[in-house]
């Protein structure tokens, strides 16, 4: 898809902060009734004066540093003028020619190769309110407006147009989200935490912007549809109109909203009620506070715990998962811990649509380590461990109580040997078949032992014992 050119504008809400960008209204509005976390400032009342939230600026500087961007010596806020119902002042306080940071990059892994996605700028702005529609944006007869979100601190991270496929765009977004969560300035599980405007053109044709896509899967689908739509137009000898489009998630298509605005349409000018922000002192405050970033953690986990890169690169995808692994690895063999967390526990959480943050509450690392310790000591089978994990996640309870209730403690080896002998004695035909070279007969004999033990024997160990007895 070398003829496809994609650039993204990613709007990130700094939702781990306590208050909004220019007022003291609390940010924890997501479960609140509409229009209850508002004040004259975020409602744009005449005479209300904004005051910059220093913690928001520090968080923004931290993000810019982690993205390898160049922090500017001073930064200025501007008024971006346009009329829309979710913008009560009639303008948005944003940044134009003096953004917080310029340049930077995010490294992704694409088809086994590293690629740097170059950034154009990182700037701060306030979030508008939230519009809701009965039905869809294209069919609704009226809009409802909730201003609880109005004035929330946003970072806009703008890439250069250097991506060539929807897959590449999604990989970039996944990596960006990971970095933001490591910095603890952002909770990606909250609604509206990350919204994307995707710009796409083909072979130098008209650039189309797809506005306000709320999920990474949606970005990939919207871009895929738009590539198909634009190529179809070009193949028929028609031109691609420069416009703004909306992604209809129900139909997986994009629909036209309006002609594309030019920058001059917004009539930017400096915000007269806010002084320029000098960043040198803030940079000094933030320097040294950056946490270990994903790639650094990946290398350390391999070095410190002796695990393979195949496990390390998965563990770092979620900082809570990596931290969970480290707690478990203090108590059991790290390689065993990595294997069970990556291959089993992660899958069970995904099946339930749970995050590792929730896992910390429901299935504490020391409990998981205790279960793996039983497995190491051959006190429970692999199948039994999986059953305990599922029961613990679904019903709760103590590990020992679950194992006792379900009868999952492994049978002593002496008893398994006794059951193997019984299976051999009771099934002479299967023994004869096995000795004549029919390997499936061994599976039958193992199955008989599993019946006798009600699944508490390890199938691989049982097969090995039977083979030794019949050799």
UniProtKB/Swiss-Prot annotation:
Q: Name the Gene Ontology molecular function terms of this record.
A: asparaginyl-tRNA synthase (glutamine-hydrolyzing) activity; ATP binding; glutaminyl-tRNA synthase (glutamine-hydrolyzing) activity
Instruction: Indicate the enzyme's highest-level EC class.
Output: ligase
Ribonucleoprotein as UniProt keyword: no
Q: What InterPro entries does the record point to?
A: Asn/Gln-tRNA_amidoTrfase_suB/E (IPR017959), Asn/Gln-tRNA_Trfase_suB/E_cat (IPR006075), Asn/Gln_amidotransferase (IPR018027), Asn/Gln_tRNA_amidoTrase-B-like (IPR003789), GatB (IPR004413), GatB_C_1 (IPR042114), GatB_Yqey_C_2 (IPR023168), Gln-tRNA_amidoTrfase_suB_CS (IPR017958)
Q: Which UniProt keywords apply?
A: ATP-binding, Ligase, Nucleotide-binding, Protein biosynthesis
Q: Which reaction does it catalyse?
A: L-glutamyl-tRNA(Gln) + L-glutamine + ATP + H2O = L-glutaminyl-tRNA(Gln) + L-glutamate + ADP + phosphate + H(+); L-aspartyl-tRNA(Asn) + L-glutamine + ATP + H2O = L-asparaginyl-tRNA(Asn) + L-glutamate + ADP + phosphate + 2 H(+)
Question: What GO terms describe the biological role, i.e. biological process, of this protein?
Answer: glutaminyl-tRNAGln biosynthesis via transamidation; translation
E.C. code: 6.3.5.-
NCBIfam families for this protein: gatB, PRK05477.1-2, PRK05477.1-4
Q: What does this protein do?
A: Allows the formation of correctly charged Asn-tRNA(Asn) or Gln-tRNA(Gln) through the transamidation of misacylated Asp-tRNA(Asn) or Glu-tRNA(Gln) in organisms which lack either or both of asparaginyl-tRNA or glutaminyl-tRNA synthetases. The reaction takes place in the presence of glutamine and ATP through an activated phospho-Asp-tRNA(Asn) or phospho-Glu-tRNA(Gln).
Record's family? Answer: Belongs to the GatB/GatE family. GatB subfamily.
Instruction: Output the HAMAP family linked to this UniProt entry.
Output: GatB
Assembly notes: Heterotrimer of A, B and C subunits.
Q: What is this protein called?
A: Aspartyl/glutamyl-tRNA(Asn/Gln) amidotransferase subunit B
* Species whose genome carries this gene: Archaeoglobus fulgidus (strain ATCC 49558 / DSM 4304 / JCM 9628 / NBRC 100126 / VC-16)
């Amino acid at each position: 898809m070398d003829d496809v050119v994609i650039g993204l504008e990613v709007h990130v809400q700094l939702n781990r902060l306590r208050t909004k960008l220019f007022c003291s209204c609390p940010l924890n509005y997501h479960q609140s009734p509409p229009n209850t976390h508002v004040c004259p400032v975020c409602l744009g009342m005449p005479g209300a004066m904004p005051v910059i939230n220093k913690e928001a600026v520090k968080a923004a500087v931290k993000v810019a540093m982690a993205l390898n961007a160049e922090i500017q010596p001073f930064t200025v806020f501007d008024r971006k003028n346009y009329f829309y119902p979710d913008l009560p002042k009639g303008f948005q306080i944003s940044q134009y020619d003096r953004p917080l940071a310029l340049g930077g990059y995010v490294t992704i892994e694409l088809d086994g190769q590293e690629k740097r996605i170059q950034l154009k700028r990182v700037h701060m702005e306030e979030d508008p309110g939230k519009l809701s529609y009965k039905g869809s944006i294209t069919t609704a007869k009226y809009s409802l407006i909730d201003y609880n979100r109005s004035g929330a601190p946003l970072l806009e991270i703008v890439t250069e147009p250097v991506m060539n496929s929807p897959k590449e765009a999604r990989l970039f977004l996944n990596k960006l989200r990971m970095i933001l969560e490591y910095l603890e300035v952002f909770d990606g599980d909250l609604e509206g935490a990350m919204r994307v405007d995707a710009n796409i053109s083909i072979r130098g044709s008209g650039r189309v912007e797809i506005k306000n896509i709320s999920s990474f899967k949606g970005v990939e689908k919207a871009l895929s549809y738009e590539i198909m739509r634009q190529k179809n137009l070009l193949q028929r000898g028609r031109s691609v109109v420069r416009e703004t489009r909306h992604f209809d998630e129900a139909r997986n298509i994009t629909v036209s909203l309006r002609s594309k605005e030019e920058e001059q349409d917004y009539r930017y000018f400096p915000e007269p009620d806010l002084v320029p922000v000098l960043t040198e002192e803030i940079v000094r405050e933030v320097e040294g506070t950056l946490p270990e970033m994903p790639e650094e953690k990946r290398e350390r986990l391999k070095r410190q715990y002796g695990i393979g890169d195949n496990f390390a690169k998965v563990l770092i995808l979620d900082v809570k998962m990596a931290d969970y692994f480290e707690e478990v690895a203090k108590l059991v063999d790290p390689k065993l811990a990595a294997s069970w967390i990556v291959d089993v526990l992660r899958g069970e959480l995904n099946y339930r649509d749970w995050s590792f943050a929730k896992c910390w509450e429901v299935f504490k690392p020391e409990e998981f380590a205790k279960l793996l310790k039983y497995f190491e000591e051959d006190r429970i089978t692999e199948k039994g461990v999986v059953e305990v994990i599922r029961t613990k996640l679904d019903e709760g309870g103590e590990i020992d109580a679950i194992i006792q209730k379900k009868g999952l403690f492994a049978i002593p080896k002496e008893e398994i040997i006794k059951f193997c002998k019984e299976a051999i004695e009771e099934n002479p035909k299967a023994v004869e078949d096995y000795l004549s070279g029919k390997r499936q007969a061994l599976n039958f004999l193992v199955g008989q032992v599993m019946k006798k033990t009600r699944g508490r024997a390890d199938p691989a160990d049982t097969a090995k014992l039977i083979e030794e007895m019949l050799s």
